[in-house]
Amino acid sequence: MSKFSFNIHHQHKKARNGVITTAHGEIRTPAFMPVGTRGTVKAMLPESVAETGADILLGNTYHLMLQPTAERIARLGGLHKFMNWDKPILTDSGGFQVMSLSKLRKITEEGVSFSSHINGDKYMLTPERSTEIQHLLGSTITMAFDECTPYPATFEEAKTSMQLTTRWANRSRNAFVKRDGYAQFGIIQGSVYEELREQSARDLVELDFEGYAIGGLAVGEGQELMFKVLDYAPDFLPQNKPCYLMGVGKPADIIGAVRRGIDMFDCVIPTRSGRNGQAFTKYGTVNIRNSKYADDNEPLEHDCLCPACKNYSKAYLHLLVRIGEILGAMLMTWHNLTYFQNLMSRIRKYIKLGKDFDFDS
């Protein structure tokens, strides 16, 4: 079994192109991870997701612990077998969903107690339990349990939250079962305060995680402020380990973040937008519901090799989406995921060539 490793093959200014080696295969970086929240990327077969060029996808601890439960997935052979995906899987810690979806949640030093958004049952999620769940799922990359600092937050609020995340990171690291080819990433917090981001990074680097994530961004602060944080935050982290920007997926944000040293991304934007009838193209976004496409016999993009573009017109996609046919959601999602993987491929090529990303997203 391969050991977990990150090799940077090319670098252009702060942008890096490399390969992460794991027990479940290699991840070309910079990488975009489609989100498979409940063990599936919505409207896609797992093999179709692989055909778009994805090397890794993301699963969600919170949702899988509620249904069908981590213990059941473990009994059935683990998440890879359960969902028929043999490439790497990264699971988030569940912390963000607990904070955003659950009512009557209570944060203490021990963890977060909350009621299920499905049936109201009460649960307790701690750093140890989150890490155990991800181990039961068989996650290739496990995330440390953290508190995603809300925005806006005062300096003192952000400091208190960051310090809790640091203590939880210690407990997550102690609970992690180290195995060849598997990894655990720590998450730095600190909101928009450079001093706090630096302290968070310093504390987590001491724990020697296999990789690091920057959390607490894309929560309402806007692109300008996010880029300001990214101008310094990746520099606080080890340059020989992957750097993951959580929950960021707009093409322009990805390009700007790669320029600042980010290696990994995840976001629901391509899948959610696809189901809602919005396609990403190199000419800009297309709202296929618009009546102007009812008689448009051209594909979304002429040089795109996805099934939606190779086989169907905008007029047909317009019809499917307008009448709510499942095929419409499937084809639009397939196209968007292909677009995002093509974007990452182009970025990797430009880094390899030592060129600035002067193409439109």
From Swiss-Prot:
EC annotation from Swiss-Prot or TrEMBL: 2.4.2.29
A UniProt-annotated Pfam family: TGT
Domain of life: Bacteria
Cofactor(s) needed for function: Zn(2+)
InterPro entries, A to Z: ArchSynthase1/Queuine_TRR, TGT, TGT-like_sf, tRNA_ribo_trans-like
Catalyzed chemical reaction(s): 7-aminomethyl-7-carbaguanine + guanosine(34) in tRNA = 7-aminomethyl-7-carbaguanosine(34) in tRNA + guanine
Family as reported in the entry's similarity comment: Belongs to the queuine tRNA-ribosyltransferase family.
Summary of subunit composition and partner proteins: Homodimer. Within each dimer, one monomer is responsible for RNA recognition and catalysis, while the other monomer binds to the replacement base PreQ1.
Function statement: Catalyzes the base-exchange of a guanine (G) residue with the queuine precursor 7-aminomethyl-7-deazaguanine (PreQ1) at position 34 (anticodon wobble position) in tRNAs with GU(N) anticodons (tRNA-Asp, -Asn, -His and -Tyr). Catalysis occurs through a double-displacement mechanism. The nucleophile active site attacks the C1' of nucleotide 34 to detach the guanine base from the RNA, forming a covalent enzyme-RNA intermediate. The proton acceptor active site deprotonates the incoming PreQ1, allowing a nucleophilic attack on the C1' of the ribose to form the product.
Record protein name field: Queuine tRNA-ribosyltransferase
Species whose genome carries this gene: Rickettsia felis (strain ATCC VR-1525 / URRWXCal2) (Rickettsia azadi)
